């Protein structure tokens, strides 16, 4: 586990600037660096800066060690774990968060719309991170293959088990209409030890068609 002290030790070796400038969703933000009131601490993570300073709460924090993907944002075209990225390391970088995807004139990003169309979420906590990782992939390749989509999302975990509909939404968006869903994800892939539950994916009556495992009784 990466502790605050470990991050602080790393950051103290990196920071030599009195201020940093970040471009977030097309807007420039300048912060002073230090330990004073209002300063960005050398140990402050991007998740903390986004959520606490800028009230951009799309990036979620769950594991805090870069293992779940909930906090993902895009930095200079690449998906990164915001909870493991020090804000002071991002001077001069371009950052895109979930809040920056929707276009004022065109509406939702195609990936966001695909998730809505396919009900590719349940509680929604992990959804922003999944969308941002998918966005980074689609920015690099407009029509990724099913395997490329799975590989890109390997670090994203959904505790509600909505992986099936996530993959379906992204494969449809990528034009992989002929991809067999059974080759994209199998029910047994979703849990290590599927105890007495139906070995089939059913629409959840509680989540407007979101996909989940459901007991036969």
Please report, for each region that a protein language model flagged, where it lies by residue:
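Signature of N-terminal electron-transfer/Fe-S-associated modules in redox systems
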Residues: 1-217
């Amino acid at each position: 586990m990466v502790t605050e002290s470990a991050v602080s030790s790393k950051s103290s070796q990196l920071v030599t600037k009195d201020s940093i400038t970040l471009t977030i969703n097309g807007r420039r933000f300048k912060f002073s660096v230090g330990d004073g009131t209002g300063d960005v601490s050398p140990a402050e993570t991007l998740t903390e800066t986004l959520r606490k300073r800028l009230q951009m709460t799309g990036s979620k924090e769950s594991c805090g060690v870069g293992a779940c993907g909930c906090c993902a944002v895009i930095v200079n075209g690449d998906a990164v774990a915001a909870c493991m990225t020090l804000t002071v390391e991002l001077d001069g970088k371009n950052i895109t968060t979930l809040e920056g995807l929707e276009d004022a004139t065109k509406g939702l990003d195609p990936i966001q719309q695909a998730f809505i169309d396919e009900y590719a979420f349940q509680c929604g906590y992990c959804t922003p991170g999944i969308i941002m990782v998918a966005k980074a992939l689609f920015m690099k390749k407009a029509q990724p293959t099913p395997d490329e989509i799975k590989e890109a999302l390997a670090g994203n975990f959904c505790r509600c088990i909505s992986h099936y509909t996530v993959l379906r939404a992204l494969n449809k968006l990528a034009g992989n209409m002929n991809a067999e869903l059974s080759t994209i994800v199998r029910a047994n892939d979703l849990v290590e030890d599927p105890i007495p539950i139906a070995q089939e994916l059913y629409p959840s009556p509680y989540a407007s068609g979101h996909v989940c495992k459901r007991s036969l009784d």
